[in-house]
Design a protein with these regions (language model features):
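Structural signature of the histidine kinase catalytic ATP-binding subdomain
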Residues: 7-10, 28-31, 55, 66
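Heptad-repeat coiled-coil signal-transmission/dimerization helices
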Residues: 12, 16-19, 108
Length: 139
């Protein structure tokens, strides 16, 4: 399923709700859905606020699919090239709560099994994959 969305927070939430419904209909565990919803909201918000700078006239795509035991969410936008996966892994500590930025990708990595970025034909493509048999990252 592919959603064509305007760059607004409301459209990000529409994508999250659509993904949740699709996942429920396909028998995905509620803990997994919760994590995927957080990851999609984080990535979608970054597309809207950073890549497309909150310009509601701009559009981006969210593609959602379940293929066997893989659940895939792909976000595509035509904003400036930016690879969020290039951020180094960091351990979260309570004292880091006041530090600005950079933590969203850590959240996304926590709730997915694979995060891949590519630049294809002028588009940022961020692909989030969750293996549905894996519960280790959900705890």
């Amino acid at each position: 399923m592919t959603l064509e969305l305007h760059a607004t927070p409301e459209e990000v939430m529409r994508a999250v709700e659509t993904m949740q419904q699709f996942a429920e209909e396909n028998g995905v565990h509620e803990k997994t859905i919760f994590g995927l919803a957080l990851a999609l909201e984080e990535c979608g918000s970054n597309v809207v606020n950073h890549a497309l700078q909150g310009d509601a006239e701009q559009k981006f795509q969210v593609c959602i699919e379940k293929n066997g035991d893989l659940f895939v969410i792909e976000l595509r936008d035509r904003g400036p090239e930016f690879d969020p996966t290039a951020a180094a892994d960091r351990e979260m500590h309570a004292e880091d709560d006041d530090l600005p930025g950079g933590w969203g990708i850590q959240l996304v990595r926590r709730y997915t099994d694979e995060v891949r970025y590519s630049r294809i034909a002028g588009e940022n493509v961020l692909r989030l994959t969750k293996r549905l048999g894996t519960a280790a990252k959900q705890e």
